[in-house]
Amino acid sequence: MTALASLLVAATVAANPFEKPGLPAYLWNQPEPVNLPELLVTAAGERVVSSAAWERVRRPEILKLFEDCVYGRRPVGRPDGLAFADEAPEKTMMDGRAIRRQVAISFKAPKGEGVIHALAFLPIAEKPTPSFVLICNRPRAKNLDPERMTRTEFWPAEEIVSRGYAAIAFYYEDVAPDRYDGFASGVYPLYGDPAARTETDWGALSAWAWGASRVMDWIETEPRLDAKAVAVIGHSRGGKTSLWAGATDTRFALTCVNDSGCGGARLNHLLLSNAETIGFLRGAQPHWMCAAWGRWGGRELDAPFDQHQLMALVAPRLLAVGSASRDMGAGPYGEYLSAKLASPAWELYGRRGLVSAAFPKAGEARQEGSLSYHLRAGEHDLKLSDWNRYMDFFDRSQKK
């Protein structure tokens, strides 16, 4: 337990940010992290004091740790035969403010072919625009309507475009199914034998994050988009996915992680009653991670990894973490503390991480550094107010 974490716990208890009656007591009586793995100490026991040492030694160590123990090893990076084709003619929409593109991102694999369908609304602008890529884990018909007859706050494309960003999304099950028995379909059988999976083979979250990188491949070919200013965003299991996407693909300038909980932003070594654990997800969603992750179920405090280390892989790029005050399963304070404990990685580059003296109250945000955190009042969801927080944060970097 570090002195920093002790101070954070004390500040949180004193601040008591959750004042509404009826909420579980754990929200204002936080336990301390136990056996927290070191961020800036190498496997050989050497302290990391420079960005060069971080990139040369410690960052690769942490990346491999999460590949082997959490998300699994990908059998492929950028695939062969990658191609992009319009599935419908371009169309001017949103009262003349945007161009719609529907793009088939196809690829060839040793055992077949695959395709990811991307939907994009590009602002009509004089110069290339920044963009947000949503990993959509909610029904396509309701949330990704290309005609915009059906709209939701989950993907508020009109509002995104009005802020000067391209709104881009893909449906996660284009890449891999979201079910425990889905390894015989999607991308998995294209690159391996589903009947001969090992404990370190990639799980669904890694496959979905791989899909986000393929959308990024397309963005790099679209001259109306600024490929140096792309944010990846996801909610819940999509938030777990966006964090892994941002950690593994340095082309994403901003990584937005919304209500992601265990396996996403929340610390495993912080025991919170009513919050997801590795043991719970091992039984409820065994396909999300590699099989090796499950060995830490019920032994979370012994795990040699934790999510502050994963967050640090995004440094020195931008990272934004969002929580909801009533999202007990995700464990908001654990998400906040993870971001705080990841901040020293940004400091190696002479940048500030999360600038915050205490856990914010519901409705507040901390966005002064390169790492943003906000706490929305409400339930587990991705709302327009969350999007506005993420766009506000990205706006600041666009103006520099």
Placement of each model-derived feature along the sequence:
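Conserved strand-to-loop "acid loop" that flanks and positions the catalytic carboxylate
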Residues: 315-332, 376-378
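Conserved alpha/beta-hydrolase "acid-adjacent" motif
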Residues: 328-338, 383-386
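N-terminal pre-domain segments of enzymes
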Residues: 11-73
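Primarily recognizes the serine-hydrolase "nucleophile elbow" in alpha/beta-hydrolase
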Residues: 139, 143-145, 213-276, 284, ...
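N-terminal cap/lid segment of alpha/beta-hydrolase-fold proteins
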Residues: 73-131
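C-terminal catalytic histidine-bearing segment of alpha/beta-hydrolase fold enzymes
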Residues: 293, 340-400
